[in-house]
From Swiss-Prot:
Belongs to the class I-like SAM-binding methyltransferase superfamily. RNA M5U methyltransferase family. TrmA subfamily. HAMAP family: RNA_methyltr_TrmA. The lineage of its organism: Bacteria, Pseudomonadati, Pseudomonadota, Gammaproteobacteria, Enterobacterales. It comes from Salmonella typhi. This is tRNA/tmRNA (uracil-C(5))-methyltransferase. SUPFAM superfamilies: S-adenosyl-L-methionine-dependent methyltransferases (SSF53335). CDD domains: AdoMet_MTases (cd02440). The gene is trmA.
Length: 366
C-alpha cells in the first residue's frame, strides 16, 4: 500500500487475516467467533495530517515511509474523505504563490465530517501576524466561494489563530436517531466515521436490556455516552482533557439529553474517589453513591487499563470494553476473566490495510 494507492482488491483477504488473528488471540478467554464490521474500502478517514515540502516554486503534501523514512509525495489520498482530497488540491493552489501563507509553512492538518464541514490547520515555524490573518481570511473566503464549508486555523509556537472557530459539528445517524457531535481541532475524534456508527450501534445492541446506570471512563467528547444514554437511567462519565469535556457538555445540550453527567478527571483519579482513597473538589455536588451502575464502559488508550482500574471494573456485573489494541485487551483479560466471561466479541475494521485492529467485548460476571 502507498498513500496514493489502496489495494482494494485485497480488502477481503486482509479482513479475514484480522478475524483469524483476533480469534487466535482471544482463544484463551473465549471460543466466540468475532462479529465482523467492515469499513468502506476507500475514503474512510475523516482526518489526516501531512507535512509540506517546498521544492523551488513547487509545493506539495508529503508523508514518510514508516520503514525507510523516505519522503513520499502525496497529491491524492484515497484513504481520506472526498472532502479532504478536494481541500488538498485547493489548499496547495491557494497557498503556493502567496508568500504570507507559504513562508515557513511545514504541516497541514485536515479534519472533516460526514456532514461536509472541515477545519484546516496550518502549522508554521514563524510568528503569525496581521498580514498572515488577512491572507488566510482571503483564502478562507475563496474556498467558501467554491462551496467548501471550511474553517482555517493558524498555529505556531505558543500561538493559535482562529479565523472564526476551531470546531465542526458532525451529525451521525445511530440506530434511527441523529446525534450531533462537536469535534474540536487538535482533540481526539474517531477517524473512521462509518466504522464509528457501527461501533455505536453494536454497543447499543449489546446493552439494550440494561438495568440501572452506566459508568464510562475515557469518554472523550461523549461519543459513546450520548448514544448509550437511551439504554440507561443515567450515565456518569469521566474525561481528563478540557477541550473534550467542553465538547461533551455542548453535545449533551445540543442533543437535549438530560441523563448524562460528565466529570473532568482521569480514570485513575476516579478509581481513587470510588475507593474512598482521595476526595476531589471536582466531585462536590455529585453523590457517587446515588448511582446504581451495573454496567461500566471503558475505551482506554493503547496501553489498556492500569491494575487499579482493572480491580475497580471487576466490581460491576457487566463490562463493555472497546479496545484499540487487542494485545493490551488480552493482558487485561488475564485479570478480568477471573471474575467475568466474554459474552460478545466484535472486530471493527477501523484501519483497513494496516495491522491495527479495533475490537469490542462484553463481559458478564460469572
Amino acid at each position: 500500500m502507498t498513500p496514493e494507492h489502496l489495494p482494494t482488491e485485497q480488502y477481503e483477504a486482509q479482513l479475514a487475516e484480522k478475524v483469524a488473528r483476533l480469534q487466535s488471540m482471544m482463544a484463551p478467554f473465549s471460543g466466540l467467533v468475532p462479529e465482523v464490521f467492515r469499513s468502506p474500502v476507500s475514503h474512510y478517514r475523516m482526518r489526516a495530517e501531512f507535512r509540506l515540502w517546498h521544492d523551488g516554486d513547487n509545493l506539495y503534501h508529503i508523508m514518510f515511509d514508516q520503514q525507510t523514512k523516505s519522503r513520499i509525495r502525496v497529491d491524492t489520498f484515497p484513504a481520506a474523505s472526498q472532502l479532504i482530497n478536494t481541500l488538498m488540491k485547493a489548499m496547495i493552489a491557494g497557498v503556493r504563490d502567496n508568500h504570507a501563507l507559504r513562508h515557513k509553512l511545514f504541516q497541514i492538518d485536515y479534519l472533516t465530517t460526514l456532514s461536509n464541514q472541515a477545519v484546516v490547520s496550518l502549522l508554521y515555524h514563524k510568528k503569525l501576524d496581521e498580514e498572515w490573518r488577512e491572507a488566510a481570511t482571503a483564502l478562507r473566503d475563496a474556498l467558501r466561494a467554491q462551496g467548501l464549508n471550511v474553517h482555517l486555523i493558524g498555529r505556531a509556537t505558543k500561538t493559535k489563530i482562529e479565523l472564526d472557530q476551531d470546531y465542526i459539528d458532525e451529525r451521525l445517524p445511530v440506530a434511527g436517531k441523529e446525534i450531533i457531535y462537536r469535534q474540536v481541532e487538535n482533540s481526539f475524534t474517531q477517524p473512521n466515521a462509518a466504522m464509528n456508527i457501527q461501533m455505536l450501534e453494536w454497543a447499543l445492541e449489546v446493552t439494550k436490556d440494561s438495568k440501572g446506570d452506566l459508568l464510562e471512563l475515557y469518554c472523550g467528547n461523549g461519543n459513546f455516552s450520548l448514544a448509550l444514554a437511551r439504554n440507561f437511567n443515567r450515565v456518569l462519565a469521566t474525561e481528563i482533557a478540557k477541550p473534550s469535556v467542553a465538547a461533551a457538555q455542548y453535545n449533551i445540550a445540543a442533543n437535549h439529553i438530560d441523563n448524562v453527567q460528565i466529570i473532568r478527571m482521569a480514570a485513575e483519579e476516579f478509581t481513587q474517589a470510588m475507593n474512598g482513597v482521595r476526595e476531589f473538589n471536582r466531585l462536590q455536588g455529585i453523590d457517587l453513591k446515588r448511582y446504581q451502575c451495573e454496567t461500566i464502559f471503558v475505551d482506554p488508550p493503547r496501553s489498556g487499563l492500569d491494575s487499579e482500574t482493572e480491580k475497580m471494573v471487576q466490581a460491576y456485573p457487566r463490562i463493555l470494553y472497546i479496545s484499540c489494541n487487542p494485545e493490551t485487551l488480552c493482558k487485561n483479560l488475564e485479570t478480568l476473566s477471573q471474575t467475568h466471561t466474554v459474552s460478545r466479541l466484535a472486530l471493527f475494521d477501523q484501519f483497513p490495510y494496516t495491522h491495527h485492529m479495533e475490537c469490542g467485548v462484553l463481559l458478564t460476571a460469572r
